Amino acid sequence: MKIKFCGIRRLEDVAFCNELQPEYLGMILSSGFRRTISPETAEQLVKAKSRSIAAVGVFVNETPEHIAQVLKQVPLDVIQLHGSETAEIVSGVRWRTGLPVWKAVQVQTAADIQAARQLGADRLILEGKAGGMGITADWELIA
């Protein structure tokens, strides 16, 4: 199991991550969300994190071109897609950025998992409800 702290917004959050050493530190880089940060802030946070922690940029329904543009300023290690992105978008993001692409999906049925596998992401993040809700997925479906 690997751990990602997500929604990181402040240098104090990064200091906490540096102390606890999760494998990943996630930052919301799409506008319109409570924990969204600017690319400028993300750049500062990435510079402050421990080298042993990978930086994950979380994007919601953005184009591969937009994500690649953000990457010019923010040195990310992983791209996480958290919207209704298609396999074509997943592939386009990977091609444009050269980074691993993770895809978050809501899991209500076994068919949801099968459909998610067709997206071609490097990793799937399986959720019970949309991100940050604290609702556990049905572990029986995932097993």
Whereabouts are the PLM-identified features?
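Conserved N-terminal beta1-alpha1 strand-loop-helix module at the mouth
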Residues: 1-143
